[in-house]
Amino acid sequence: MAYTNKVAVAVGAAVVFLAVVMNPRWTEAQTYPKLDRLCVMMIPDILEECFTHDRLKPTEDCCNDLKNATMTQVDCLCDNFLESLSFSDLSRTFSAGVLKKCDVSHKYMCQAAKNRGEAKGGRNSTTTCDNSITNTSVGGKNKVATSMSAFGLVAILLFVMF
């Protein structure tokens, strides 16, 4: 076998490792929906009033506030609370029960808001409001897995060489 300089091989392997791990195409910033001031101030109070107390029947204030929010703050309510991961901490059956008892049909409300936004050339959300969490960042998970497998390959090559 030919003589190889172990320092040069180690430096080359380190450069390849850093190029694979630090590739900027694989890192994407997570985007969050933009919140307006009214949404930030109004919606959390409604959610706290309606969903943090384990009642058999929601209060009249809760239902009135929810109905008002579904008419004036549909985008905020759907995008940031009903369809977001922050809302997933609440029991799905409990939250659906509160919305049903308040006679708020959120499944159709969110879909109608999405359709209105697309008709105006606005929102391009691909989520639906069926009380399920839709993850649109699946590609990011695959890129992390690819990066980790590349790291493993480089580590194996280093161990084989030395």
Curated annotation (Swiss-Prot):
It is found in: Cell membrane. It comes from Arabidopsis thaliana. This is Non-specific lipid transfer protein GPI-anchored 27. Disulfide bonds join 39-78, 50-62, 63-102, 76-110. Keywords: Cell membrane, Disulfide bond, Glycoprotein, GPI-anchor, Lipoprotein, Membrane, Signal. The lineage of its organism: Eukaryota, Viridiplantae, Streptophyta, Embryophyta, Tracheophyta. It holds the Pfam family LTP_2. CDD domains: AAI_LTSS. A lipid is attached at residue 137 (GPI-anchor amidated serine). GO terms for cellular component: plasma membrane; side of membrane. It comes from the Eukaryota. Glycans are attached at residues 68, 124, 135. Its main location: membrane. Probable lipid transfer protein. InterPro entries: Bifun_inhib/LTP/seed_sf (IPR036312), Bifunc_inhib/LTP/seed_store (IPR016140).
